[in-house]
A protein has these predicted regions:
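Contiguous, well-ordered alpha-helical segments that form the cores/surfaces of helical PPI scaffolds
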Residues: 79-86, 122-134
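Post-Walker A helix-loop "phosphate-sensing" segment adjacent to the P-loop in P-loop NTPases
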Residues: 131-140, 163
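A structural signal for short, well-ordered beta-strand segments and their strand-loop junctions
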Residues: 111, 142-145
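Walker A/P-loop
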Residues: 104-129
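Conserved nucleotide-state-sensing and coupling region of NTP-binding domains
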Residues: 144-181
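N-terminal accessory segments
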Residues: 1-108
Length: 181
């Protein structure tokens, strides 16, 4: 095991400890995940604790799987964006257990306005679309942007993460798609 892998494992363990009990939503599940973590349960892999916590904690999902995008401390505004997705799309449900139910729920209509550079697209278009695809609660994700080039860029970034991101591959398996458009 090289130093980079050791550093990543240390990062992932600290991140899990920092996030598992940080909020009160899904509190029973959070407590059980913490108990299992303390007992030495596997953090990674298809049944790992990371995948289970990231199912309903979008802030954790971004930092655990997309740490190269979420490098600085997030402003509270990003928590508000996550809350919009959690309430509007997930309806407070846990996609690890309720993906099929979530996929059949009515959608939501929300408008978010913020200045350029506030990571609205990074959160909604990129992170949350990737989350929906990996946890299988949205089957047809539409990406709208100022231009087709910008939308294609987001799709390309999502494709790259699904196919090449080692953390995603470790927990979700091979996500290589046949057609991307």
């Amino acid at each position: 095991v090289d130093q980079e892998e050791k550093d990543n494992e240390q990062y992932q363990r600290k991140l899990f400890r920092d996030y598992v009990l940080r909020k009160n939503d899904h509190l029973e599940i959070r407590r059980e995940l913490k108990r299992r973590f303390d007992a030495g349960a596997e953090l990674t892999g298809p049944k790992g604790l990371r995948k289970q916590l990231a199912a309903f904690d979008l802030g954790y999902f971004g930092r655990a799987y997309l740490k190269h995008y979420f490098v600085r401390p997030s402003p509270s505004f990003h928590e508000e964006l996550d809350e919009i997705w959690t309430k509007g799309v997930l309806k407070g449900r846990n996609p690890a257990m309720d993906a099929k139910k979530i996929s059949r729920l009515d959608g939501s209509k929300n408008v978010v306005a913020a200045p350029r550079g506030h990571a609205k697209s990074t959160n909604f278009t990129f992170k949350d679309s990737l989350h929906a695809a990996l946890y299988l609660y949205k089957h047809y994700i539409i990406i709208l942007s100022d231009s087709s080039d910008q939308a294609e860029g987001f799709l390309s970034d999502i494709k790259t993460e699904m196919e090449d991101n080692q953390e995603i591959r470790l927990d979700f398996g091979n996500q290589q798609g046949k057609v991307w458009k």
